[in-house]
Amino acid sequence: MKLYDSYSNQLVEINDELISIYNCGPTVYNHIHIGNARPLITMDVLYRFLKKHNIKTKYVLNITDIDDKIINYALANNLKELEVSEYYFNEYLKIKKALNTLEMINPKVSTHMDKIIDYIQKLIDKQAGYFIGDDVYFDTKKALNYGQLSKRDLENDIVGMRIESAANKHNPNDFILWKKTNKGIMWNTPWGIGRPGWHSECSCLINTYIGEQVSIHGGGIDLKFPHHENENAQNQVLYNKNLAKVWMHFGLVNINNEKMSKSLNNFILVKDLLAEYDYQVVRWFFYQADYKQPIKFSHEIMKQNEKEILKIKNAIYNAKNYLYFNNQLKSLTQIDHFELFDERINDDLDFVGIVDLIHISVKKINILIKENKDMNELKLNLTQLLYMLDILGINFVDLHNDENLALLNTWKNYVDKKDYVKADELRKQLINIGIL
């Protein structure tokens, strides 16, 4: 498998015996919007593919449940921070399930504070952490090739961009590891009472759950700087290596030609989208573009995706009906690989090529049914389609149970006997079920 690495700007082959994945998860102070869903769904496809091929995989997606946004929300609403974060964490789990994503490890920042404090102490011991009063800062000059991941000019581009301002910083790009505070939740440390900076949390969790280097680190492209750059800098200081072998960055979701974000107040919550569209449609939307590139959202686009999903579903049900009427449904088996599809997944998750393959497969199935072609070829094309959709996390309810098959058989008998009145009545029932 080759994936595009944002650090080297090259395709990098991943062939680790155990492929480890870390995906930057949500800050749980609100419901997630569809921009947050893109990394979740894209990485789920990769994870499904690896598991399907029995490749040892460890997938970690963190939960940031300590953050100024959470604290401010809690104070404004007379709540405890962890009450807020726990509520939205559980809402996030519901969304993950509704989107049909596989389970992964979800460590919370709040339950790993001892590890984070130890991690920061190691940076201090390496003389990469220094004090300004009771705050601890990271000295970016101690990191090898700082700025390489985000491809920024340190002197001209980075200064002033989401960098904590403080007098007496060694370098304008230095960032906070631990900040003293008397507001909100806090922990006691050898350096005083406070809470950690955002960048140390993720790098520490990777170190805790995976080790000195993760195979694949994913996240939205808007996290490349400063978050991922600063994660990487800490790891370079501690272990003299990049934090990840491959940095995967996912393109933004745009609405009205603007980045969708909570700060711009132009976001659409996933829970609201799922109230309007089936999860299959939402997932299918994200496969319409290269995962690295921006993707445009509109309800017109979603309606088109809805039509395409219906066409795919109808092809599957029609093929199963056809096989049933020809006594071939029971002999339908699963496959564990499909070379054309696997090649596209292994080629940096070529979603555009995969979508084309699925459209071709649906067209073939419809032609084979219409022209009463070779039954084995129909079964092969159907199993290939089901294999592809399963890895894309798109499944449909199997309506071909004994009860529905009996109804289908009765309907077919009415048609054969030209009893069209009864056939039409039963056909309406089968349409309501969804099998016709």
UniProtKB/Swiss-Prot annotation:
Q: Can the keyword Ligase be found in this entry's annotation?
A: yes
- Major place of residence: cytoplasm
Short sequence motif 'HIGH' region: positions: 26-36
Which Enzyme Commission number(s) are listed? Answer: 6.1.1.16
Q: Name one GO cellular component term.
A: cytosol
| UniProt motif 'KMSKS' region: location | 259-263
- Stored InterPro entries: Cys-tRNA-ligase (IPR015803), Cys-tRNA/MSH_ligase (IPR024909), Rossmann-like_a/b/a_fold (IPR014729), tRNA-synt_1_cat_dom (IPR032678), tRNAsynth_Ia_anticodon-bd (IPR009080)
**Keyword annotations of the record:** Aminoacyl-tRNA synthetase, ATP-binding, Cytoplasm, Ligase, Metal-binding, Nucleotide-binding, Protein biosynthesis, Zinc
Q: Which Pfam families match?
A: tRNA-synt_1e
DNA-binding listed as a keyword: no
Task: Please give the cofactor(s) recorded in the UniProt entry for this protein.
Answer: Zn(2+)
Q: Subunit structure of this entry?
A: Monomer.
Checking HAMAP family in the record gives: Cys_tRNA_synth (MF_00041)
NCBIfam families the record matches: cysS (TIGR00435)
Protein name in UniProt:
Cysteine--tRNA ligase
**What species was this sequence derived from?**
Ureaplasma parvum serovar 3 (strain ATCC 700970)
What's the gene? cysS
